[in-house]
Amino acid sequence: MKVVSNFIFTILLTLNLSAALEVVTSRIDRGGIQGFHGDVKVHSGATWAILGTTLCSFFGGLEVEKGASLFIKSDNGPVLALNVALSTLVRPVINNGVISLNSKSSTSFSNFDIGGSSFTNNGEIYLASSGLVKSTAYLYAREWTNNGLIVAYQNQKAAGNIAFGTAYQTITNNGQICLRHQDFVPATKIKGTGCVTADEDTWIKLGNTILSVEPTHNFYLKDSKSSLIVHAVSSNQTFTVHGFGNGNKLGLTLPLTGNRDHFRFEYYPDTGILQLRAAALPQYFKIGKGYDSKLFRIVNSRGLKNAVTYDGPVPNNEIPAVCLIPCTNGPSAPESESDLNTPTTSSIETSSYSSAATESSVVSESSSAVDSLTSSSLSSKSESSDVVSSTTNIESSSTAIETTMNSESSTDAGSSSISQSESSSTAITSSSETSSSESMSASSTTASNTSIETDSGIVSQSESSSNALSSTEQSITSSPGQSTIYVNSTVTSTITSCDENKCTEDVVTIFTTVPCSTDCVPTTGDIPMSTSYTQRTVTSTITNCDEVSCSQDVVTYTTNVPHTTVDATTTTTTSTGGDNSTGGNESGSNHGSGAGSNEGSQSGPNNGSGSGSEGGSNNGSGSGSDSGSNNGSGSGSNNGSGSGSNNGSGSGSGSTEGSEGGSGSNEGSNHGSNEGSGSGSGSQTGSGSGSNNGSGSGSQSGSGSGSQSGSESGSNSGSNEGSNPGAGNGSNEGSGQGSGNGSEAGSGQGSGPNNGSGSGHNDGSGSGSNQGSNPGAGSGSGSESGSNAGSHSGSNEGAKTDSIEGFHTESKPGFNTGAHTDATVTGNSVANPVTTSTESDTTISVTVSITSYMTGFDGKPKPFTTVDVIPVPHSMPSNTTDSSSSVPTIDTNENGSSIVTGGKSILFGLIVSMVVLFM
């Protein structure tokens, strides 16, 4: 059955194709729907008009002979539009006469869809719609050639689309294609010597990255509102453009941006080429010579600063003859049988508008109803150098055009260049020699112009000015009193260009470096100066749409700007003397937080069992045996929650190292409370060793481990040990340790075993006020160990816990582990950097040199490690906080000195070295 069905279908198709329609005499057909099966041929001299139709379909090939006409028109009122479909994959479409499809009277959507196995136009094709709504016109075929005239127009602009050929194939245009109120986005390669004329706000977008346009093909911007846009992300091409001026636009699909070697756009007067650049992606437009570079400026064309306009008349109006073929509305369709007797076809005496057509003169539009397109070839002879002139006169009100051409002229395709005069109403005369001399004059006039800065950008007119910003990448080098400044501008843009329904995205990065030099005067003797920079970042999001979709683009602009130089070096040094307790306070407070919990759990028993008479002075400069367990409970919470400074300042006879313990006590004050409250092992260890210390160790146990527990619990494990050792000896320790450590942990210590066993966290974090008042009287015999432990907890706690949070390291007897740490900050260490804009941020570049010392058995400090770190300059947008950043910053203490905070990786090498030495 299926075989029979296929056989019947084949027979019917053969009958339809064989039923060809031959239009030999003129005729008019009327009706809403028209359908024609088989090939249709309109013979020469015949006119066929199909009127009052809304749908006209052809199922076969179409041929209109020379001297014949085919009119299809919708005149059914403003609602019903014209739809014409001619789609055959096996038969050609050939036009040598006139084809006119007209839907201008309709207010609804019209569609012209004509295609075949091949498309050839040697005559005239007119496609007209109202433009009230978006209409489409497609002339497609794999083999597509136009040697005649195609006019596609709308009464007004409504984003109508027109397309030629088959996507990703090649169309050949040797004739004239006129577009009015249209959007033309070809999806094919274009070759030939023809012209596409954009008029009445027509927008042409050559938008495919893999398709090319031959330089011999011409684009003519006829009015001031038309635009030609080229896809930026594409291979470099040169597009031949005529009529650029009076405000029309040439552009790219990306914003125009320069780089270190080129400006955003450059005009070369010697060649007449305009270069547009989206960073590293240039495109070239051959617009002609004689333009004034001061009249170029950057504007928008359905994008963000992506086009250039020229605020002046077209200086060189040499337009090829093929671009001057009149873009008329075409002949009118016959309305009655009587109109069929009136000739309505145009006369085209040259069969091709290829290179031969460019050798012919061009006539202007006739004002009569019968359009006459006549051209006569010039009788130039290749073997003669004589100048031959040809004049063609057209009857009625047509314009006479005189063309003079040298047969040996080097103009493209041997065609005469027609230079339109300003009057443009009577005669159009050209001479290649005259235009050449004018171009040379214009070139000599503009060649002297160097780079010009306008409100929209910098324009380069000569090669000398284009290299003005070329420079080599160098780093910033500084010496006392002088700095070399480099302005490094980086622009990274992600742009999305959108029409109504469709968007595309592109990414562009541009770099520019400009060196200069400044002299700086030091504010003090040998303090060098450094240059601060302000970095400004602007981010914008752009949404564009086309007919299909929308998309967004993000554009980020970053610029570094140099400012007034300021003091660059600040050094903070803490020595081993007891007077330098401030340095210890700063170091300790920063580092105690990480190690508290670890130290607390381990130092609890040490404080409890080892701080007899000697350990008392370590942690609180309190009484000997009485402060043994108070050392554990009292110094724990005191050190942890806030009595680091008391520890240092109140140590008994160990004032020298106690002051360094003071530096450690500040570490303890910040971190002890945190660690004490969180260390579970502190309560266990404290309860066991605290009671031992208090009852059994007394003065002996204090002297044995006082130095160790002082160092460990002094700053780090204070809060944990406070609650733990208190369980055994809390009441005793509380009375002895109070003045040194117990400003905050006293309340827990006062209750002795109760707080110790159950309230380790409470003692560490919040019981300082009671303990502080009781322990003032207790100053024991632990002055020596107290001073050692103080110094150990002073800087050891600070240094170790700075980079290794929670890392536990025991001090070794005989070493003053409370040794000082020198921190030298070189760079822009400025409390108030100088800037010129409140919206800008300051980029700080620092060099951190950290030297740590330890005191040996001979009592002299000895450096054992030095770390120089040069971090990468970093800036954050203003009013933005990034707590996760590991980039070091410069903070200023209350006394005006500077310290390095953040950047945990900076001190990691230092701490590892210290741990290795201690082991």
From Swiss-Prot:
Describe the subunit structure. Answer: Component of a multiprotein complex of 250 kDa composed of at least HYR1, MP65, and PRA1.
Protein name listed in UniProt? Hyphally regulated cell wall protein 1
Q: Where is the composition biased (Low complexity)?
A: 344-392, 415-475, 567-590, 708-724, 784-798
Q: Write the signal peptide boundaries.
A: 1-20
Please give the sites of covalent lipid attachment annotated as GPI-anchor amidated asparagine. Answer: N895
- According to the UniProt entry, which residue ranges have a biased composition of type Gly residues? 607-665, 675-707, 725-783
Taxonomy of origin reads: Eukaryota, Fungi, Dikarya, Ascomycota, Saccharomycotina
Question: Is Signal there in the keyword field?
Answer: yes
Q: GO terms for CC?
A: cell surface; extracellular region; fungal-type cell wall; hyphal cell wall; side of membrane
Q: Which GO terms of type biological process are on file?
A: single-species biofilm formation in or on host organism; single-species biofilm formation on inanimate substrate; symbiont-mediated perturbation of host defenses
Question: Any idea what job this protein has?
Answer: GPI-anchored hyphal cell wall protein required for hyphal growth and virulence. Involved in innate immune cell evasion through conferring resistance to neutrophil killing. Binds kininogen, the proteinaceous kinin precursor, and contributes to trigger the kinin-forming cascade on the cell surface. Production of kinins is often involved in the human host defense against microbial infections.
Query: Which ranges are cleaved off as propeptide?
Result: 896-919
Q: Which organism is it from?
A: Candida albicans (strain SC5314 / ATCC MYA-2876) (Yeast)
Main localization of the protein?
A: secreted
Print the keywords alphabetically: Cell wall, Glycoprotein, GPI-anchor, Lipoprotein, Membrane, Secreted, Signal, Virulence
**How does the UniProt record describe the way this protein sits in the membrane?**
Lipid-anchor; GPI-anchor
PTM per Swiss-Prot/TrEMBL: The GPI-anchor is attached to the protein in the endoplasmic reticulum and serves to target the protein to the cell surface. There, the glucosamine-inositol phospholipid moiety is cleaved off and the GPI-modified mannoprotein is covalently attached via its lipidless GPI glycan remnant to the 1,6-beta-glucan of the outer cell wall layer.
Q: Gene deleted: what happens?
A: Leads to attenuated virulence in a mouse oral biofilm model of infection.
Does the keyword section mention Ribosomal protein? no
What is one Pfam family matched by this protein?
Answer: Hyphal_reg_CWP
Q: What induces it?
A: Induced specifically in response to hyphal growth. Expression is repressed by neutrophils and purpurin. Regulated by RFG1, EFG1, NRG1, TUP1, CYR1, BCR1, and HAP43.
